Amino acid sequence: MSSDYSNISELIEEEYNNSKSVGIFVSRFDKSEGVGTVVNRHISELNDAGIDVTLFAYEQVDEIAEKKVVNVSSSLTGNNTLNKLISSMNPLKWLSLSSELKKLDLLIVHQPILCSIAYYAQKIHDIDTIYYNHEVTRPEDKVGTIQRIYGYTLFQIYLHISSRLDQIVSVSKYSQQEYSRRFDRQGMVIHNSIDHEMYNQSVDGSRIREKYDLEDDPLVLFVGRIAKSKGIHRLISVFEDVSKTIPDATLVIVGRPDNQGYYQRVKVLSKSVDQQIIFAGIVPEEDLPAYYSAADLYATCSIKEGYNLTIAEAEACGTPTIAFDIGAHSEVMNDGVLVPKDNTSLFKEEMVSQLTKQR
C-alpha cells in the first residue's frame, strides 16, 4: 500500500509544522470501534511527537489518561442521537466552545456531524482544518428511524460541509475515490496503521483457547461491531454450513452490539449451532492480539469498509484471512482470500479449505 504520508504526525510535521496544539473531533470515542481505534492511535502518535491534543466528543466510552476532553453534546433530551444533532446545528453551542477552540492550531474531524463546529472555527478563528474521511456512508445503511431521517437530511449537509474544510485525508484509495466522486476533491491518502509491537506473530494465543476450552478445535474469529453492515448474520449462516463439514469448528465473535434488535436477530440465527458460537463481547485491546493468534482463520462478511483494521491486525499476527471483495479490502489484505461479493457458497468453500489447511 502506498500513502502520501506514513502517519498523521508526519503530515503535521511536513505541512503544519507550526501546529503545537491539535483538536481531534470524534462523535463517539470508543476504542472497540474502528474510528475510535484510529483516533486513539493518532493521540498516541501526536503525543510522541510533542504535540498537545484535546479530544472533542459527543460521547466518551473510554478514558484517556491525562488528556483533555471537551464534551460537545447537549443534554436537552434523553436521546443521544437527538442531543448530538441539537449541538451540531446550534450556533450558541459553537460559541460556548470558542475559548477552547482558540487555543488550537489545527482541527482534525473524523465524522461529518462535527464538521459544522470545525467550519465555524475555520472561518471565525482562522484555524486550519482537516476532514479525516473513513468512508462515505449511505443513508440507507443507517439503523433506526432517527438515524435514517438524519441520513437523508442533515447528514448530507454535514457531508457537504466536510468538503469545505481545508484538507481532506482518506484512509484508503477506495475511500478517496468515493469521496472525490461525490465532491470532486481528491485530497490525500494516509492508510491506517497498526502497532506492530502489539500485533505480531510472536504473540501466544493459548490462553484464549484455554479460556473457552477449545483445545485444538478449529477456531474462526470475527472482531468488530455486531451490526448489519458487518454481515454477522451472513457469517453465522456460512459458519453453520461450515460446521456440517467441520463439526468441531468454533466461531468467536468479539465486539459490542450496535443495535439490540439486530443483536437479538443474530442470536436467534446462532441457535442451530449455539454450542459452537461464542459471543465474547468487548475485550480490552491488549487482549486482541491473543485472540488473533489463537484463531485458525479470521473471517468477515462485511459489505462496506473504508479500510478494515481487523484484517491488517489479524495478518500481522500471522492469521489467515477471508473476506468479500468490497471496499478497501483489496488494499488492506496482503495474503488472504477475497471472495466475490454476496457469493456465500464460495465463501463457505474457502473457509472449509482454509480451516482444513490449518489442521
Swiss-Prot record:
Q: Does the keyword Glycosyltransferase apply?
A: yes
EC numbers, comma separated = 2.4.1.-
Instruction: Explain what the UniProt record notes about the effect of disrupting the gene for this protein.
Output: Impaired formation of the tetrasaccharide present at 'Asn-532' of S-layer glycoprotein Csg. No effect on 'Asn-47' and 'Asn-117' glycosylation of S-layer glycoprotein Csg.
Pathway the protein takes part in: Protein modification; protein glycosylation; Cell surface structure biogenesis; S-layer biogenesis
Top-level class of the enzyme under EC nomenclature: transferase
What's any GO biological process attached to this entry? protein glycosylation
Keywords from the UniProt entry: Glycosyltransferase, Transferase
Whether Secreted counts among this entry's keywords is no
Output the superkingdom of the source species: Archaea
SUPFAM superfamilies, sorted: UDP-Glycosyltransferase/glycogen phosphorylase
Which residues are listed as membrane-spanning? Answer: none
InterPro entries assigned to the protein according to its UniProt record, in alphabetical order? Glyco_trans_1, Glyco_trans_4-like_N, Glycosyltransferase_grp1
Q: Name one Pfam family in it.
A: Glyco_transf_4
Q: Which GO terms describe its molecular function?
A: glycosyltransferase activity
* Family note: Belongs to the glycosyltransferase group 1 family.
Role this protein plays: Hexosyltransferase involved in N-glycan biosynthetic pathway that takes place under low-salt conditions (1.75 M instead of 3.4 M). Participates in the formation of the tetrasaccharide present at 'Asn-532' of S-layer glycoprotein Csg, consisting of a sulfated hexose, 2 hexoses and rhamnose. Involved in the addition of sugar 3 to the disaccharide-charged dolichol phosphate in the tetrasaccharide.
* Protein name (record): Low-salt glycan biosynthesis hexosyltransferase Agl9
Q: Which organism is it from?
A: Haloferax volcanii (strain ATCC 29605 / DSM 3757 / JCM 8879 / NBRC 14742 / NCIMB 2012 / VKM B-1768 / DS2) (Halobacterium volcanii)
